[in-house]
Structures are given as C-alpha cells and as structure tokens.
C-alpha cells in the first residue's frame, strides 16, 4: 500500500512539472499568435 502511494505521488509530481511547462509554452504561443495577427492587419491596412 505504501509503495503504491509513493509511486502515485511521484507520477503526480511529474505531471505537475509537465503542466507548468505546458502553461508557459501555451502563453508564449498566444503572445506570438497575437503579434502575427497584428502584423497581418497592419499589412492589410497598408
């Protein structure tokens, strides 16, 4: 029982680390997408 619990906690910590990395990557992608959309709009206006 105790070994099982330790295994679960280890897996949860790994998932948490991946989740934080994914949040950072998603934020970066959103920012990049906004910049690209802004640039395309400027091009259309010109």
Swiss-Prot record:
Keyword Methyltransferase: no
Compositional bias ranges of the Basic and acidic residues kind: 1-14
Region feature (Disordered): 1-46
Classification via InterPro entries: Phage_T7_Gp1.1 (IPR013232)
Keywords noted in UniProt: Early protein
Keyword Metal-binding among record annotations: no
Function: The function of this early gene protein is unknown.
Protein name, entry field: Gene 1.1 protein
Organism: Enterobacteria phage T3
Taxonomic lineage of the native organism: Viruses, Duplodnaviria, Heunggongvirae, Uroviricota, Caudoviricetes
């Amino acid at each position: 029982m105790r070994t099982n619990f330790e295994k679960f906690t280890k897996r949860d910590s790994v998932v948490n680390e991946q989740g934080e990395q994914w949040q950072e990557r998603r934020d970066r992608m959103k920012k990049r997408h906004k910049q690209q959309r802004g640039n395309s709009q400027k091009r259309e206006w010109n």
